């Protein structure tokens, strides 16, 4: 298994353990007005966005480009909706979106993987690049490892 595949598998194992969080832990503040559940909604959104980016690549042969400014705008616009999710739904959506993203990545032809590895888009393959900082953020908020 390639490194990104192994890292994604390990990340999914950690994400699945989020089901053990209590309601109080899901409501913990993570900073900037976000709760643990908000972070999970954010993670689910970006894994679903990843699927659309792969759809675009498959259809058009090019990646849908996003600048750092786009991410800031998306986060600002999405935070209210992510915060409104019932906490248990945020957990379920996060895990489901991550599983779908990893399944899509695992199904990519090796030639596509090779193309991505030559670009600054490695996060399209290795989801832990996005998940890991958020998992650390969650662990800090709840005061324990997941």
Predicted regions and their residues:
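Hydrophobic packing residues in well-ordered alpha-helices of helical domains and bundles
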Residues: 4-12, 36, 87-94, 124-127, ...
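Generic detector of short, locally flexible boundary/turn motifs and exposed helical patches
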Residues: 2-6, 56-58, 65-68, 99-101
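Alpha-helical bundle segments that constitute or directly flank the non-heme di-iron/ferroxidase center
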Residues: 1-23, 48-55, 129
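Acidic/histidine-rich alpha-helical segments that form the ligand environment
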Residues: 8-11, 17-20, 73-112
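Residue-level recognition of alpha-helical structural elements
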Residues: 4, 32, 83, 87-90, ...
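Short, contiguous alpha-helical
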Residues: 26-73, 110-146
């Amino acid at each position: 298994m390639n490194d990104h595949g192994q890292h994604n598998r390990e990340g999914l194992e950690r994400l699945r353990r989020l089901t053990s969080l209590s309601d109080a832990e899901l409501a913990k503040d993570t900073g900037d007005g976000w709760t643990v559940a908000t972070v999970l909604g954010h993670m689910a959104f970006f894994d679903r966005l990843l699927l659309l980016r792969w759809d675009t690549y498959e259809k058009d042969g090019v990646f849908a480009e996003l600048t750092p400014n786009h991410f800031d705008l998306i986060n600002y616009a999405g935070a209210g909706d992510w915060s409104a999710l019932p906490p248990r739904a945020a957990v379920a959506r996060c895990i489901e979106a991550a599983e779908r993203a990893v399944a899509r990545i695992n199904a990519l032809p090796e030639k596509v993987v090779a193309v991505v590895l030559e670009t600054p888009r490695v996060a399209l393959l290795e989801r832990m690049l996005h998940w890991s900082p958020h998992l650390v953020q969650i662990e800090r908020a709840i005061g324990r490892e997941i």
